[in-house]
Amino acid sequence: TAANYRVNVPGIANLLIAHTHIAPAPVEVTEPAGPIAYWFSGGPPPGANLTERVNGTLADGFIITDGDVDDWDPMNTPDSGTVAGLIRAIKEGRASVVVHTDDLDPNTPTGVAGDSRAGELRGTLQ
């Protein structure tokens, strides 16, 4: 079992991290997005901040082994932390990608383009 992915972004600056969240229910009816299952960029904090603007493909590749996936719900989901579980969550509409940005300037108001630690871009994985 493997998953192929590509994350495209429209000219984003100050990329901090990008990852997949797995929610307990379909993303459009649950808040928050759920625990992190896979890191596209930046890795677990403190990841490196990318200062150049990214326009187009941010990340692409394959998720092949269960070791590539974080265990997002070990108590309640038998296939949590597996590639098969990630694929099932995507098919069920429970997986989303969140791209966080930060200009690393404490004087910049958060939530503006290029400085949104809460997630500048969000979308359901398909």
Where are these regions (language model features)?
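N-terminal leader/targeting pre-sequences
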Residues: 1-126
